[in-house]
Amino acid sequence: MFRDPTAGWLTPPSPLSLLVMLLLLSRVGALRPDELFPYGESWGDQLLPEGDDESSAAVKLAIPLRFYDAQFSSLYVGTNGIISTQDFPRETQYVDDDFPTDFPAIAPFLADIDTSHSRGRILYREDTSGAVLSLAARYVRTGFPLSGSSFTPTHAFLATWEHVGAYEEVSRGAAPSGELNTFQAVLASDESDTYALFLYPANGLQFFGTRPKESYNVQLQLPARVGFCRGEADDLKREALYFSLTNTEQSVKNLYQLSNLGIPGVWAFHIGSRFALDNVRPATVGGDPSTARSSALEHPFSHAAALESYTEDSFHYYDENEEDVEYPPVEPGEAPEGHSRIDVSFNSKADPGLVDVGTSSPGSDRASPWPYPAPGNWPSYRETESASLDPQTKQGRPVGEGEVLDFRDPAELLDQMGTRAPAPPEADAALLTPVNEDLGGRNTQSYPEAGPVPSEPDVPVPPLEGEVLPHYPESGHVPPLRGGKYVIGLEDHVGSNDQVFTYNGANLETCEHSHGRCSQHAFCTDYTTGFCCHCQSRFYGNGKHCLPEGAPHRVNGKVSGRLRVGHIPVHFTDVDLHAYIVGNDGRAYTAISHVPQPAAQALLPVLPIGGLFGWLFALEKPGSENGFSLTGATFVHDVEVTFHPGEERVRITQTAEGLDPENYLSIKTNIEGQVPFIPANFTAHITPYKEFYHYRDSVVTSSSSRSFSLTSGSINQTWSYHIDQNITYQACRHAPRHLAIPATQQLTVDRAFALYSEDEGVLRFAVTNQIGPVEVDSAPVGVNPCYDGSHTCDTTARCHPGTGVDYTCECTPGFQGDGRSCVDVNECATGFHRCGPNSVCVNLVGSYRCECRSGYEFADDQHTCILIAPPPNPCLDGSHTCAPEGQARCIHHGGSSFSCACLPGFIGTGHQCSDVDECAENRCHEAAICYNTPGSFSCRCQPGYRGDGFHCTSDTVPEDSISGLKPCEYQQRYAQTQHAYPGSRIHIPQCDDQGNFVPLQCHGSTGFCWCVDRNGHEVPGTQTPPGSTPPHCGPPPEPTQRPRTVCERWRESLLEHYGGTPRDDQYVPQCDDLGHFIPLQCHGKSDFCWCVDKDGRELQGTRSQPGTRPACIPTVAPPVVRPTPRPDVTPPSVGTFLLYAQGQQIGHLPLNGSRLQKDAARTLLSLHGSIVVGIDYDCRERMVYWTDVAGRTISRASLEAGAEPETIITSGLISPEGLAIDHFRRTMYWTDSGLDKIERAELDGSERKVLFHTDLVNPRAITVDPIRGNLYWTDWNREAPKIETSSLDGENRRILINKDIGLPNGLTFDPFSKLLCWADAGTKKLECTLPDGTGRRVIQNHLNYPFSIVSYADHFYHTDWRRDGVISVNKDSGQFTDEFLPEQRSHLYGITAVYPYCPTGRK
């Protein structure tokens, strides 16, 4: 056995076990402990120190290792079953949390492991020995027969956890648990790719999860996490891409019982590549245990089986967990339905290195789906290398029976035995790997420190019937290399007798350049003549269009018709067609509205109109495929129906036009011809039937005849018709032929129904379908409910057949539940989506879509949003034809449209402007001199007068006494007589009662205002123009983030033109706080004013004389003022209860005192299609309010019986989450994590106002203290989480708490204790503080995953995502007192308390 002698296993390995491990022959028996990769200190392993949270020093790698799309030169090994490319944070930051982690992680068994007191050991090393690399290569090639067929690793990194135990808080006198785990991770890489192997030997896993330290005594055990995480991308600050294999205890147990490459306990994954790799891709070559030699295994060997028992806590949505389905080549003798067994046989008459792993014919003991060479084609290793197995066989002779081998050091022995497995040949020569080895020993490859390794021969594969052998290029003409493979373009030489292929690599479409043409749920595969798309596991379709398996689907379309019904012509155009398909039992319902009555009645028997959807989405029997798996969402369906005996003939053409933005199929139907007349009182009855569909290239045909009956009372007539169907589509011609479906399939229609409702004007069809092989009449046999649709799975769940009539149900991707009841998952609210920066996630039923924000559009990959290049603006790029900048301004109207307007002081068309001579208009004082300047003018008082030129006074000084006056009083008294510069303003200072300067000074005649210091000096930058809000004489306001307006840009342009400081006689536009033109504009600092419109144009006839202001009307309508509604008298409630949000419903949970009355809990309101997150209650009008992130709305409903919901806000929302009601002021407040805003509005949705839109990253919870007028909210920004506060009108914003918090999800204010309390999903604590942030204390520090919290009486109640319930916590003791788990197990969001009265509290 391959163990370090210190491991305690002293039995030497046998030659048989060595060869078995080297050659890796798949079999269904579980992995034995001695079949792990060799490890131990004698193999060069390093030991990790004992402890609970240890990590290795950086292990420098010889060559960089690729992980996802990056390269790393060092690795770290941690105690807790994890490997990373960077040093680990403290274990409390990741060991008890679900994926994804914040750092890169490779986790074969992430749990709280403790090796203290010699409880196991952890070993790791980098290895380049040929034996280890060869074994890793064989695993990879087995699991990835296409993409990994030429994988030749050059380095491997091994980490082994041997007999390690879980962390335990052992009580005094109790012995530690004897449950110990052994598992191994191997990372094999070459220059281009990295593959990971996880190995779990039989009985190697004895514990399957650990209990979190912070809540160790709560009896909560977290299953081990197995998978990979890329880590947070620093440049994008988005959550990490990840792949998870486990989520429940059963899925952890499956690790050693199942496999994704056919060997129980061995799992393989493609985790890094220098080519595009959207996510980790698991191997998909699992076998079937029904033929396995292990009676203990009861589940299929498949990745899907390993992921059974999903729960919402760790549901891994398909966009985050894209599986690359590999299609292994199938030989002509493939075992039925893929069930196979691979055995190992040793040829005692041949070289001991020769091993037979051939593929046998069906029915033999060695039937295998993997195309290994036949026994006669296996390579014979050279004698010099074979002889090294035993020093006694110096000539390399075979070891005879009864001879005993003398084993030396295992490393030396395995290095000399190193070999690589031959790559599986492709039947269609799809991939041609470079030939660099042969049996003669030429071009042998040497592994470092391992000596030469036997080369692989090219194994000839017998051609299939009708197949043409490829003509390989001669030496020196090597085909181009792409993606680590040689890809050859093939061209037929028609008419050539030798029928050879030649190679043409020009213009070949490849995945690298065309991957965007595949569905987002598909992977792309290069073939010799091009590429094809294939849907991932758990999806079906043609690769270009993929839908989730088992999920319901919808079809929308239009129907037009030109019919003759009997002898009556009937026409109709573009009437609506809608179809609903229950995917997991093959039911298809079709409804066509607004068809004229005679035509609708006559079309009742024409079932193929809706029967198409039955064939498209039929329930598939094993080995069969429905229509959508073949055609995808683009095809043409032609039907010709001939009625008998009248020979009426009608033709139906249905054209599928792809999937719409909601992922629904769009179809256009046209009906033309003649149909028999059917009276209005007759109904049509169609018995179950079978149809045969024939498949060839890109055409499907079907021809059948059947009868139907028309009944009315006692009348029963039987008619018949003949149906010819033809379905054409575009198949991918590049895929190998062995991927084709059977030539003929049978569609069985168990139930058929047709009905026309004249009252509704709707024609309906319903069919229940299953498709499978052609059946031969025989005695009836039991059918698994999954195949005939009789199962009890939810309509959004997949049915997994088991043995006999047993089956299991699993919710399809995008839904959650136990399979018998599934609800939609909001990927947008939970963060499980791939929408990138500058995009918005929109939740759909069973899925989601990404929309670019305003000003952005999708790039070619349809995921990334890029900035839309703005249209040219002639006003900015200088292409306008306006007069020069100092004379006119350009006004942009969108696109390339603009207009020109002369500036004040100029007159003209805007394209040509001339100066206005203001002096000719006598605008100055009679004792002043006027000076005209381009675009303006100035006035100066004549000698002997003082003033600003518009007002001049005689230059005389009063003789009043000035003794005893303070500076403000002095300046105030003698303002008119102080020295004034030409054009200066006369301002009379304002003083307070003590004679000091009032901080806010305003010019009495012009309305200019500014701030002054204690000496009366103006504070720079505080002056405001007339008509605007006076400045707050304190700290300057925060800079605005909005774009500059025309007024602001014009003002800045003139200020720059004036050199930064305009004279008092120069005009500067006056703008309000929002950048709009103030209706009243004045010249310089004078009171010579006029009115302007919203674009700043002067309104003719509004200029005034000095001292008189024109009455200017604002161009923006004032806000509507509505009266506050009078509070109605509400009868007292019978008690207090809790309301909680749970996706599509609002739940009601009564309280008896502070105890939960769980038996009286019920659903208060069902809201189909909604995702209710935030919830609060208006105690004055007994109304409940909630936010809906699916509908992007805020709604309310009365608690009176029979009340209907009312939507009050329907626009301007992206992801409304937190909600708070102020019952005093009749207002509501909410957070929007999509827009990063906090808004307020009246309770009817009016008077909306954005309070904050800056310095917010992930705002969530919000609460209000209406008595004291304070607002509080949380922001769970991972880099800087915080709790903030402000007044209710948005003033005095400040950070209240930003230390020692992680993910503050829930927030509540207790009006009785005046405490602000929050529940933190990061620190797992419930804490409280006084409103000013002081007196902070911890109530409970062992929460699981809280989302929302509310306070009532002596308890807190919070919703919990780990328990999916409501948890109650005593305020005084901090103890958990009770919990309520709703019958429908899904995440609970917001929670609020409904009092029988309005709480008043005390100031």
Curated annotation (Swiss-Prot):
GO biological process, one term: cell-matrix adhesion
Annotated glycan sites: 386, 475, 681, 716, 726, 1152
Molecular function GO terms recorded: calcium ion binding
Post-translational modification: Highly N- and O-glycosylated.
Domain NIDO: 108-274
Region described as Disordered: 323-403, 1021-1043
Bias (Polar residues): 386-395
Record key words, sorted: Basement membrane, Calcium, Cell adhesion, Disulfide bond, EGF-like domain, Extracellular matrix, Glycoprotein, Methylation, Proteoglycan, Repeat, Secreted, Signal
LDL-receptor class B repeats by residue range: 1182-1225, 1226-1268, 1269-1313, 1314-1355, 1357-1401
Subcellular localization(s) per the UniProt record: Secreted, Extracellular space, Extracellular matrix, Basement membrane
Disulphide bonds in the chain: 511-524, 518-533, 535-546, 786-799, 793-809, 811-822, 828-841, 835-850, 852-865, 875-890, 882-900, 902-913, 919-930, 924-939, 941-952, 968-991, 1002-1009, 1011-1033, 1047-1071, 1082-1089, 1091-1112
Gene3D superfamilies attached to this UniProt entry: Green fluorescent protein, Laminin, Thyroglobulin type-1, TolB, C-terminal domain
Residue ranges annotated for the Nidogen G2 beta-barrel domain, each copy included: 551-781
Signal peptide: 1-30
Subunit record text: Interacts with LAMA2. Interacts with COL13A1. Interacts with EFEMP2.
Function recorded in the entry: Cell adhesion glycoprotein. Might be involved in osteoblast differentiation. It probably has a role in cell-extracellular matrix interactions.
Protein name as catalogued: Nidogen-2
Taxonomic source organism: Mus musculus
